[in-house]
């Protein structure tokens, strides 16, 4: 009986590993959603999965602001450049680094908090993003689609105002979640050699850089983008169109100002 039980357990483990590998390998960002709401028990599973993510000192230095009301999603939409998915998706989750809650607890226990500085902003960001990714994996396990919104840091001050964030709390990303209304192709990725280093950092040669990006640069999607943008190569699409120097500097200045306002620069 014990042997049968052990064999059954091994089969279950193998099936679980295969399912997890398949789930992670088929991830795609979804930008079109049906209006169907997320079942409360599914949302609860997602949030519980988020709460089990690794966290600095078991402090859970994050807050997940779950917005489902149409009114608030419409208020947030301009912060995300009015992308339709913000109002299409039934659930918008703003992920924040949060030292406010832990600091309050310390103060109420006669323990002086010391988390209003840049080091603890970084710890909060790490906690927040780990929780966010756990949430996304759980959502996809339920057959839902997700998309991270990088626009969060562009308009973080307005998001903080709309969501009434106190000092010690700052938005770091946003996730839209819902039932997919599209099935896009998988996007390409750089080969593992591009991102994995053995023992020490590998310093790339020019020819290695060419090789790592060769597949991306010769893809049909890249050819289409080059034609649309009238640019000679993929790198210039990033530097001249998508993420321009002047925009990057403006976003950085604005976010640094909000960090100071929210009390993260007492260094």
Language-model regions, residue ranges each:
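Single conserved hydrophobic/aromatic residue that forms the stacking wall/gate
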Residues: 1-15
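N-terminal capping/interface segment
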Residues: 14-62, 74
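Glycine/small-residue-rich phosphate/adenosyl-binding loop
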Residues: 59-129
């Amino acid at each position: 009986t014990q042997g049968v039980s052990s064999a059954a357990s091994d089969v279950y483990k193998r099936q679980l590993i295969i399912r997890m590998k398949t789930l992670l390998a088929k991830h795609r960002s979804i930008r079109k959603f049906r209006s169907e709401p997320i079942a409360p028990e599914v949302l609860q599973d997602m949030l519980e999965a988020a709460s089990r993510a690794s966290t600095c000192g078991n402090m859970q230095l994050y807050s997940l602001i779950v917005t489902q009301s149409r009114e608030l999603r419409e208020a947030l939409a301009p912060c995300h450049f009015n992308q339709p998915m913000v109002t299409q998706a039934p659930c918008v989750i703003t992920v924040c680094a949060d030292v406010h809650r832990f600091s309050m607890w310390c103060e109420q226990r006669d323990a002086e908090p010391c988390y209003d500085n840049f080091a603890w902003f970084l710890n909060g960001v790490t906690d927040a993003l780990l929780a966010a990714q756990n949430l996304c994996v759980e959502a996809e396990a339920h057959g839902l689609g997700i998309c991270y919104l990088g626009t969060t840091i562009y308009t973080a001050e307005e998001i903080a105002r709309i969501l009434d964030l106190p000092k010690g709390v700052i938005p770091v990303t946003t996730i839209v979640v819902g039932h997919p209304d599209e099935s896009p192709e998988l996007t390409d990725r750089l080969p593992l050699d591009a991102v994995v280093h053995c023992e020490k950092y590998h310093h790339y040669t020019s020819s290695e850089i060419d090789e790592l990006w060769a597949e991306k640069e010769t893809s049909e999607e890249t050819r289409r983008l080059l034609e649309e943008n009238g640019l000679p190569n993929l790198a210039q699409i990033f530097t001249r169109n998508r993420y321009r120097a002047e925009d990057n500097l403006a976003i950085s200045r604005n976010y640094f100002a909000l960090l100071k306002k929210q009390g993260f620069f007492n260094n």
